[in-house]
Structure formats: structure tokens, C-alpha cells
């Protein structure tokens, strides 16, 4: 933000996801709860503020940018028939556990070892259910990621 303040002569905008508030709805009953458990474990296992969007307005003020407006926009990622190649690949990664394996270090830091293995087994089972529903063309999933958009005015007379 300090760099925004330094290089801009007028308006700046910051668009930040609130990854702590991501929600999932799915036709696979276990997917919603498992997604939440995995997200919570991941967030405990990383050392990053994933909800920065809610703080941008005050952070603007701290560096001398006058906040003008803040709005939240929800981005929806839908999976429904006909399934894209990305959706099919995602289902395969769930069933194989590959998606969790990509973040195993962070997840293990967020849960104990036995819980990770239990979580991974449940995740793979859920992935197999996703594939079964996809074969029947009945699988639908909506992931909603809230984004905070903050616009501010740089004080160009401050130099």
C-alpha cells in the first residue's frame, strides 16, 4: 500500500479475497463439511492473514490513502453438467487425494498426523462420490469466494 501511495497521483484500488469466508454447496453431502474441515486445518497450518480484505480500509488510512468506498463482491465458481476438463481433473484429484497432498505440510501443521490421515481417507471417499455423481450427470457444486474491493484517494499534495 505504501508503494500505491508513492506511485499513484489519484485513485488506488485493492481487491482482496476473504479466504476465511469461502463457502461451498454441493450435491455430495460430505463435501461441504469436509471442505470446511480442510480449509480450517489449512488456515491453522499457514502463517498468513487470509482475511486481509476486511482490513484494507484501515490499512489505507495507515499509509495516508483516504478510503472512499469499500464493497464486497461474491465470486461464484460453479460446477455442473456438462463438466469441463478442469472439473473432471478436480474430481480425479479429490478421489486420488492428490489435491490434499499438494498442501500436506500445511494441513499436517493444522491437524495431528492421525487426523490428517483420517481426513485424507474421507476426502478420497468424497471424491469417489463426486465421480459417481458426475457419471450420472447429477453432481453440482458452488464455491463462493467473497472479495473486498476498496477504493482510495491518494493525497498528491503530501509530497
Q: Model features per residue range: what roles?
A:
Residues 66-159:
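Conserved Class I S-adenosyl-L-methionine
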Amino acid at each position: 500500500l505504501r508503494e500505491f501511495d508513492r506511485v499513484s497521483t489519484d485513485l488506488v484500488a485493492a481487491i482482496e479475497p476473504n479466504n476465511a469466508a469461502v463457502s461451498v454447496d454441493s450435491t455430495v453431502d460430505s463435501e461441504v463439511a469436509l471442505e470446511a474441515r480442510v480449509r480450517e486445518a489449512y488456515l491453522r497450518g499457514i502463517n498468513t492473514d487470509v482475511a486481509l480484505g476486511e482490513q484494507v480500509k484501515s490499512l489505507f488510512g495507515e499509509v495516508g490513502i483516504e478510503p472512499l468506498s469499500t464493497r464486497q463482491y461474491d465470486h461464484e465458481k460453479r460446477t455442473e453438467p456438462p463438466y469441463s476438463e478442469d472439473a473432471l481433473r478436480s474430481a480425479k484429484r479429490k478421489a486420488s487425494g492428490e489435491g490434499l497432498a499438494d498442501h500436506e505440510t500445511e494441513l499436517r501443521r493444522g491437524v495431528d498426523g492421525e487426523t490428517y490421515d483420517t481426513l485424507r481417507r474421507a476426502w478420497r471417499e468424497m471424491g469417489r462420490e463426486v465421480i459417481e455423481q458426475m457419471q450420472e450427470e447429477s453432481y453440482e457444486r458452488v464455491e463462493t469466494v467473497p472479495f473486498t474491493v476498496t477504493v482510495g484517494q491518494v493525497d498528491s499534495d503530501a509530497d
